[in-house]
Design a protein with these regions (language model features):
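Soluble or luminal CAZymes and related metallo-dependent hydrolases
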Residues: 11, 15, 56, 97
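An amphipathic alpha-helix signature
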Residues: 28-32, 58
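A beta-strand edge to alpha-helix "cap/lid" segment located at domain peripheries
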Residues: 2-7, 42, 59-168
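Short, aromatic-enriched amphipathic alpha-helices that serve as compact interaction elements
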Residues: 8-26, 149, 153
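Short solvent-exposed beta->alpha transition segments
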Residues: 40-61
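Charge-dense, low-complexity intrinsically disordered segments
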Residues: 2-6, 10, 48-51
Length: 168
């Protein structure tokens, strides 16, 4: 068994956290810093995708921020030194929804994210404001249940980035 390189592991974790910051900031520059040009993002059936390439992924999440006020949290993160698995919450405050899921991340030789596999608890049900595991007490386990406030710097960056994006 190969012993994971702690420095590589730390860079991978930083890249995934920076990816979530890119989503929350709606920042093409931040996406460029962490996603490979040919990154692929796969989704469950009927959820769209796969999205091929960094620009397609950035377009997707910037569109969600613009339309739904989307915000994401990392609720759990596991890294074995080769891949990362994240459990997350995607808040959509403009439409009163949230969805929880998990994703696997792979990385290219340069340390950029080159693959993302999204898994949801169930297919997206538009009649439910919270698509979550049935009977799982998120609040008791200290999961967020409301969209987080963005820190002032990230919020300002987000507004600036959205102002510079063409409207859909």
């Amino acid at each position: 068994m190969t012993v994971p390189d702690p420095a590589r592991r730390d860079r991978m974790i930083q890249a995934v956290r920076a990816y979530f910051d890119a989503c929350n900031a709606a920042s093409r520059d931040r996406f460029a810093a962490v996603l490979s040009d040919d990154c692929v993002h796969w989704f469950p059936p009927e959820a769209g995708g796969p999205y091929l390439g960094r620009d397609a992924i950035a377009d997707l999440w910037i569109g969600f921020v613009r339309a739904k006020g989307s915000r994401w949290t990392i609720d759990r993160l596991v890294c074995d030194g080769e891949e990362i698995c994240v459990e997350w919450t995607h808040f959509k405050p403009n439409v009163g929804e949230r969805i929880r899921g998990s994703e696997w991340y792979t990385f290219d030789a340069g340390g950029k994210i080159d693959g993302i596999w999204a898994h949801y608890a169930s297919p997206r049900d538009p009649d439910r404001p919270a698509n979550e595991l049935e009977g799982f007490d998120y609040a008791a386990r200290a999961y967020p249940t409301a969209a987080p406030e963005l820190d002032a710097e990230l919020g300002t960056e987000r507004e600036r980035n959205l102002a510079n994006e063409p409207s859909a």
